[in-house]
Amino acid sequence: MFSDTGAFLAQTVEPLMVWDKPWIYGPFAWVFHQHISLWGTVPAQGLICSHLIWVLARVLGRATPMYHLGICAALAAFTAAPWSAGMVMPDILTPVAILCAALLGWGWDGLGRVERIWFSVLGVIATAAHLSNLPVIFALVVLAMLLRLGWQGCLRVALPLAGAVALLLVTNLVGHGRFAVSPYGSTFLLARLIADGPAARTIAARCPEAGWYLCAFAGRLPTNSDVFLWVPESPLNRAPDGKAIFLGGRELAPEASIIIAETLRQEFPAVVADVLRNFVRQLRRSQIGDTLTRHDVGFGVRPVLAKGFPPEEVARFDGSRQMADDLKPLARRLVPLHSLVLLVAAGFALMAWRRAHLARNARALGLLLCILVGITGNALATGALSMPHHRYQARVVWLLPLAAMLFWRLPQSGDEQRRSSPSSASAGTRRASCRNGSPIN
């Protein structure tokens, strides 16, 4: 769990529309835990990932039960995948959104009717679950256009994005009375621009004439965006007279939009340079371990559990290894192994890219590039919109070893076409049974 887990649980326990989080992941998690046990949500997230991996392997012509078990076992042992899937947070839905968009775009012919509907719905929910997913999936739409997937294929890739935007508009209108994708998201972008410097310089140059609330803090604004957003003593949460501000991030959003617009007009090249610098910083941060301590959980999760879940679930939470601070030492021992696996996987993924390009395998090339663009796009989006943290990139970086295992040695195009159909497995079973003298009707 993480400190934000309490807010997502509160979305259905209270129920509550949290100002800084889409009303998406809380209801999604509720479908599986039903306010009984969070052990319903965690296996469900793992099964969703497993199914996506199975279908991806199938459309590539590589799906067999033993091969699938081997891939899942390797991901569980050597990557951050189980650490993200095992967290009651929307982090795991970022790679889910990427894989859904990839399969809808380049694996459509290999999907059954139910799978097409399922991945469309799942892709919409996964994309809407975290605002940083929107630019990531937009990057995949651009990729589809660059690869000339065709207008139907591009529309299929764009379906999760369009559906997510519609879902966010409706939920924010109902919950906040504002027809907006992110009613108060400007506060987060302002925090990033202040920490990087451009917005802080704008405030210093325009104050006190501008009359902004933040003019009172010109020249002494925090240089850490997390401090600005969450520390009780920050200008966002405490007025110059020392009085605490309730939901300061929500209240500052209109002024934040004005300052952001002024900053972009005055210092656009500097903002772009900072975005690229933060992108590189985020791309290099992908280790597990920054959400695993008792301190990372904070004090907001237990009260929600106590209010909405049985006492047995609260007792399990209190007795968990995370609350005993036993998880981070284990994670620290795995970090060197994970880093080595990523380094090796990057080489195999690049070789697979070259082979798919030389073979003119459009399906494999599109799916592989979708994964690679999704990984880098995630770093760009989170680096631009937030302070770089390991968990932001750890949630998707396991897709690189997955790509290395699935793509580095693909079957011949004829074999791929025969084995990518959803009915191919059952057809193979029928042929085997006929050879054994036991035809299946």
Question: Each predicted region: which residue ranges?
Answer:
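Transmembrane-embedded, aromatic-rich helix segments that form part
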Residues: 132-146, 157-161, 182-183
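Membrane-proximal stem/loop segments at transmembrane-domain junctions that anchor or position
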Residues: 182-313
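Transmembrane-helix motifs of polytopic, lipid-linked glycan transferases
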Residues: 39-67, 73, 77, 96, ...
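Short acidic/glycine- and proline-prone juxtamembrane loop motifs at membrane-interface regions
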Residues: 83-93
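Membrane-interface anchor segments at the N-terminal boundary of transmembrane helices
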Residues: 35-44, 277-371
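Extracytoplasmic catalytic/substrate-binding loops of multi-pass membrane glycan-assembly enzymes
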Residues: 1-8, 16-28, 32-36, 181, ...
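Membrane-interface alpha helices of multi-pass inner-membrane proteins
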Residues: 116-130, 141-142, 160-170
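Membrane-interface transmembrane helices that cradle and orient dolichyl/undecaprenyl
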Residues: 101-118
